[in-house]
Amino acid sequence: MTNYAIILAAGKGTRMKSDLPKVLHKVAGISMLEHVFRSVNAINPEKTVTVIGHKAELVEQVLAGQTEFVRQTEQLGTGHAVMMAEPVLENLTGQTLVIAGDTPLITGESLKNLIDFHINHKNVATILTAEADNPFGYGRIVRNQHGEVLKIVEQKDASDFEQQIKEINTGTYVFDNARLFEALKNINTNNAQGEYYITDVIGIFRENGEKVGAYTLKDFDESLGVNDRVALATAESVMRRRINQKHMVNGVSFVNPDATYIDVDVEIAPEVQVEANVTLKGQTKIGAETILTNGTYIVDSVIGERTVITNSMIEESSVADGVTVGPYAHIRPGSSLAKDVHVGNFVEVKGSSIGENTKAGHLTYIGNSEVGANVNFGAGTITVNYDGQKKYKTIIGANVFVGSNSTIIAPVELGDNSLVGAGSTITKDVPADAIALGRGRQINKEDYAKRLPHHPQNK
């Protein structure tokens, strides 16, 4: 049978106290809406309709081209939100999943199981439920002695007996598509909130003697709906625990998983060692046998095999096999480090390519530069790439030796096998195989220091 899906993403999320629509708040690197959308895709829906409202344009940008959108200009309840999908889905045959866009922990496996349960039991409606240790505040699932679902009762309306029920409504449902939109025509706003509730559809089906079932989640965490920053932090914690467990099962070692922060789309090869307080974000990929030490922060970068990154930051860059970075190095966007490069402590590389086996051991800035293989940068080397208005490029050939405390003022080119003397300021091209000396001549004035206040004889 054919599956369809409706994702409810129109709400403002007042309790988030944010200008950002609630469903766009991120969990492990992507928005809650994207998490839900990915899980929904596990049921292979022929059509997915996302209901948007508050700051609809922002929400639409996140899933542009991946779903159909309908607008809920007034937020009049969950039932009203589902009504907005009627022009797209009402005449179709199959079953429709209805899910909130603020449930980032739901898994595709659970949604597939829910759909299968719905079909196998020939239900008109199936409620996704969970067993809560503390069900206070949730709608309870009331069953008869045969285990059949009778109704959903909200906390404020529950009797003392019903309040003891631990099975709760998660707010996710599967409906026979045609019957869903027929029943929606019969719900009203005769309730304390003055809204159209999707749960009223369940009551209509029961009154008609139609079969309503409930499928219970194995993991209560999946039921979490995020309404405030506290729940958002809970979702973040659960998601990161899942992510880290997945990587450990796949052969990655963590010194302290609870203090390691890895986004959902990060890829890590086996035999990688990850120490505490490491953060890996975005589309980062880490090659096999790499070591990431305490304090390393990597964003949208590709790291090769057998690299060692020590307490350093790498952003939007590529690092080849066998490279060592840090401690306290900063590889800024647009940089590439070739095989066996060494970038040491307090070195910054920005928008530059560095050739194989090149070494910048300490206290160096390499910006907007193209650096060949086997180059050595002495401590304190600075490529001066900005004149206050425009940035310029430095080109350094292979096998170049740059002495300590040298300043290379772009645009300039250092030819292959050249040498720059320590303390030089280079403003002109240096030919291949040449030595460049660009510093003032040293002058010694004999006994002159005796005239100065610091000298012992003057104290």
From Swiss-Prot:
Gene from which this protein is expressed: glmU
Annotated protein name in UniProt: Bifunctional protein GlmU
Enzyme Commission number, as recorded: 2.7.7.23, 2.3.1.157
UniProt key word Cell inner membrane: no
CDD domains per UniProt: GT2_GlmU_N_bac, LbH_GlmU_C
Keywords from the UniProt entry: Acyltransferase, Cell shape, Cell wall biogenesis/degradation, Cytoplasm, Magnesium, Metal-binding, Multifunctional enzyme, Nucleotidyltransferase, Peptidoglycan synthesis, Repeat, Transferase
Organism expressing this protein natively: Streptococcus gordonii (strain Challis / ATCC 35105 / BCRC 15272 / CH1 / DL1 / V288)
GO biological process: cell morphogenesis; cell wall organization; lipid A biosynthetic process; peptidoglycan biosynthetic process; regulation of cell shape; UDP-N-acetylglucosamine biosynthetic process
Binding sites annotated in the UniProt record for Mg(2+): D102, N227
PANTHER family: BIFUNCTIONAL PROTEIN GLMU, NUCLEOTIDYL TRANSFERASE
Region spans: Linker: 230-250
Region Pyrophosphorylase, residue ranges: 1-229
